[in-house]
Curated annotation (Swiss-Prot):
Example GO biological process: peptide biosynthetic process
HAMAP family, A to Z: EF_P
GO cellular component: cytoplasm
KW Cytoplasm (keyword) present: yes
A GO molecular-function descriptor: translation elongation factor activity
Similarity comment: Belongs to the elongation factor P family.
Protein name: Elongation factor P
Role according to the record: Involved in peptide bond synthesis. Stimulates efficient translation and peptide-bond synthesis on native or reconstituted 70S ribosomes in vitro. Probably functions indirectly by altering the affinity of the ribosome for aminoacyl-tRNA, thus increasing their reactivity as acceptors for peptidyl transferase.
Pathway: Protein biosynthesis; polypeptide chain elongation
Keyword Cytoplasm found: yes
Length: 185
């Protein structure tokens, strides 16, 4: 059991006899009245997204989720193909199931495939990835303003904010959960 006040992104719960994954949550403490948690929940079977408000002390049962490490092979335009590195079994998932999970994932990287009772419903990227910057504005001598950033496109096509000293060809480390630059590699 988990309290609504402890919700976080990616958590899977049982609600109304269905399995839902928490996509977004917001703890709200109004000036008048009791606090509440506003959430967006995705039904893992249908893909439907609902908005629901809970009291922070409401308790929900956690759904048991199976996690399998799989290698991302390729995308054929419609489907994304993954292979279990232990059994060499391959599965294909559509864009809806994958979502933005592969935003920072290159072919042959290892990802976690999520399933419930044998039904695959999502993909989790590795927490940290190292990618090469393929396009960004050049930094100029004297760009020393603290905290200044610029957009940079990495080899997977995703765009993130990086410090001014990062140039094309640099390898950078990215936190995929926050989509933020961490360091130069």
């Amino acid at each position: 059991m988990v309290e609504a006040g402890d919700f976080r992104r990616g958590l899977t719960i049982e609600y109304d006899g269905q399995i839902f994954q928490v996509i977004e949550f917001l703890h709200v403490k109004p000036g008048k009245g009791a606090a509440f948690v506003r959430t967006k929940l995705k039904n893992i079977k249908t893909g439907a997204v609902i908005e629901k408000t809970f009291r922070p002390d409401e308790r929900m049962p956690l759904a048991h989720i199976e996690r399998r490490e799989m290698q991302y092979l390729y995308n054929d335009g419609e489907l994304y193909y993954f292979m279990d590195t232990q059994t060499y079994e391959q599965i294909a998932l559509n864009q809806e199931m994958v979502g933005d999970a592969l935003k920072f994932v290159k072919e042959n990287m290892t990802v976690t495939v999520l399933s419930h009772n044998g039904v695959v419903f999502g993909v989790e990227p590795p927490r940290f990835v190292e990618l090469e910057v393929i396009d960004t504005e050049p930094g100029f001598k004297g760009d020393t303003q603290t905290g200044a950033t610029k957009p940079a496109k990495v080899e997977t096509g995703a765009v993130i904010q990086v410090p001014l000293f990062i140039n094309v060809g640099d390898k950078i480390k990215i936190d995929t959960s926050t989509e933020e630059y961490l360091s130069r590699v």
